[in-house]
Design a protein with these regions (language model features):
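Basic/aromatic-enriched alpha-helical hairpins
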Residues: 12-15, 27-88, 107
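DNA breakage-rejoining catalytic core of tyrosine-based enzymes
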Residues: 68, 128-154, 210-241, 259-260
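Short basic/aromatic active-site micro-motif
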Residues: 70, 165-168, 271-276, 292-310, ...
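Basic, Lys/Arg- and aromatic-enriched nucleic-acid-binding interface segment
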Residues: 91, 95-99, 110, 116-181, ...
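Active-site/catalytic core of tyrosine-dependent DNA strand-transfer enzymes
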Residues: 104, 145-149, 239-291
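Catalytic-site neighborhood detector that most strongly recognizes the C-terminal catalytic loop/helix
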Residues: 142, 205-207, 321-347
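Short, polar N-cap/turn motifs at the start of nucleic acid-interacting alpha helices
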Residues: 191-198, 293, 312-334
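C-terminal secondary-structure termini that scaffold catalytic or DNA-interacting sites
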Residues: 196, 209, 216-235, 327, ...
Length: 368
């Protein structure tokens, strides 16, 4: 007897049972998985998952398939179709697309649905054309020292943008702190300890949709300050340099002069969404100061880049940034300068120290 005949014999004698195939589509399992995720991950992470699903999965042939009928070939076909069909998919975006397929099918297996196979995800990654993924076309550069000094002078001393003085002072102070914009927006005077010369980071401003019991959005996006941070490593204390203390003193003088009772450092007389207000303020501030525009996140990256250039160990930089590992810091936060010719030339002179004399190197000139 061959294997098939043995199996048929086992089935007919009741020794081998055939699992009942359950007719559940990928879309149905995704909904169950998404409802489960709402209770275990942050709301803004759920929003990102939903956006990715709606863009690449919703309405596709893939989500209409019964999960019991899906195999590696189907997953490869779908993911390849996304990469090739959409074009210009970055590695970061693809990781979000892949995460949904992987997590939903693993979840279906966890539910012990009849007929759902155990997928070989390593094989799937091998056959998906990840070589066609593109690098992020936008490249950040560190803010030049001259631009930073110009911004500091025009904000702190000249009050270039008086209507948004609090926001402007917070933005330029962040060159000494390296905070995420949500952390900067949520800073209050209770977080500032001028006696010990530290700022304590333990909360952030978030944005996310409220959802009902079915996982559907309820109303507009909600902005809120939460006693939480991105990761457990983000709870930290940042030492204050004398320059940062000076800016804080200027900020306190401004709040006292205006009679502000609000505790937020970036408060400018109106209860606005502070993250959005800081973003808009920076755009105008760059224009008023005649410097090339950069984002609030580039301030954070410039902070890390300048500390790295000073010789600070990456472990310490990661601690100040609130990163869980040094790889994140080194891979994503150490930038180049747009105009770095002289710096590169200096390092090349120092490192490539073999010289020519009349067409010969120093070493060969001494050979006999």
């Amino acid at each position: 007897m061959n294997l098939d005949e043995w199996i048929d014999l086992g089935i007919s004698n009741g020794v081998v049972s055939v699992p009942e195939i359950e007719e559940k589509t990928f879309e149905e399992i995704y909904r169950q998985w998404f409802l489960m995720k709402i209770n275990v991950i942050k709301a803004q992470s759920c929003d990102r998952i939903e956006v990715t699903y709606n863009r690449y999965y919703a309405g596709s042939w893939f989500v209409k398939q019964n999960v019991s009928m899906l195999d590696e070939a189907a997953v490869i076909r779908f993911l390849t179709g996304v990469i090739v069909g959409w074009g210009n998919i970055t590695s970061k975006e693809f990781s979000r697309i892949y995460q949904i397929a992987n997590n939903v099918l693993v979840y279906a297996r966890f539910l012990q649905l009849g007929g759902v196979r155990l997928f070989d995800w390593e094989m799937i990654r091998r056959y998906v054309p990840e070589g066609k993924l593109v690098k992020d076309p936008h490249k950040d550069f560190a803010v030049p020292r001259a631009d930073i000094e110009r911004l500091l002078r025009m904000v702190v001393e000249q009050d270039i943008y008086p209507v948004k003085r609090s926001a402007c002072l917070c933005l330029v102070m962040n060159f000494y702190l390296g905070l995420r914009v949500g952390e900067l927006a949520s800073l209050t005077w209770q977080d500032v300890d001028l006696e010990d010369r530290v700022i304590r980071i333990c909360k952030t401003e978030t944005k996310a949709y409220r959802r009902d019991e079915n996982g559907e959005r309820c109303g507009a996006m909600v902005y809120a300050v939460v006693e939480d941070v991105k990761t457990v490593y983000s709870v930290r204390e940042i030492p204050l340099l004398p320059e940062a203390v000076y800016i804080l003193e200027k900020l306190r003088e401004h709040h006292d002069r205006c009679g502000y009772k609000n505790q937020y450092l970036a408060y400018d007389g109106r209860d606005t969404v502070r993250v959005r207000s800081l973003d808009r303020t920076l755009r105008k501030l760059c224009r008023y100061c005649d410097v090339k525009y950069f984002s609030t996140h580039v301030i954070r990256k410039t902070f890390a880049t300048m500390l790295h250039g000073s010789g600070m160990p990456t472990r310490y930089i990661s601690d100040l940034m609130g990163h869980s590992d040094m790889v994140t810091t080194e891979r994503n936060y150490i930038l180049s300068y747009r105009d770095n010719y002289n710096a590169l030339l200096g390092y090349m002179h120092k490192g490539l120290d073999f010289r020519l004399r009349g067409g010969e190197t120093d070493e060969s000139a001494g050979d006999t």
